[in-house]
Amino acid sequence: MRQRAEEEAKNAFAEAQRALRLEEKKLAEEEDMLERMVEDRKRRREEYSRKLASGEMKVTDQSSANRFLDRMKEKEVEQKDRIEAQREQVRRAEKEVKKAQDALIEATQALKALQKHKENW
């Protein structure tokens, strides 16, 4: 019975670790997305500045370009919020891993104590 409890604790620990890795992967993807968004906005801003300086873009077009850049910035803020929410998910997953690890240690110690008791009996 204690051996089964240890196996269940091992399985729960492995599942918690898998869930943590998944949440960390999602976080990395969200952070990469933000990085791409920032780079895209900077690239477009430079492109618009170059076009305005060279005369390819009219001054009247500049206001719509600025509005577009502002919308891009707003999307970056939304992405930062998603990243923070994902960081919280990672923290929760880390707590679950710690809890599962503690349960595994407890189950292993109980099994070893029982085995030692059997040896001495």
Regions found by a protein language model. Name each.
Residues M1-W121:
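Charge-rich amphipathic alpha-helical interaction elements
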